[in-house]
Amino acid sequence: MEIEEIKRLVETKKFTVLKNKLQGMNSADISEILDELEDKESVIIVFRLLPKEKAGMTFSHMESDMRQKLIQDLTDAELKGVLDELFMDDTVDLIEEMPSNIVPKILKAISKEDRKIVNELLKYP
């Protein structure tokens, strides 16, 4: 799917059509499209249309700055859904690469048990 088609579907609010098209795409391609979208609002709309599992996979393929923007803009529940789909080591990597002002939101979104594991992994050399 071309970036222009995505932009057109968002602008015309054809979200059902867009959601169906995204279903057939792989996560790496969706990540590239999100990186190419200039409009932050469009990125959020497209990301929110993804099923939970695909959103997690797409998130793991994104550039660090795009992930940071999404973390800031997603609700706590949405962020929890995305983080639940990541492998624990990916969550640790995410925490290590994010600025210190973003980390508390990530930690708040993961379960208490997962937070303990993350803390242990962060201590591991």
Give the predicted meaning of each segment.
Residues 1-125:
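Hydrophobic packing positions in regular secondary-structure scaffolds
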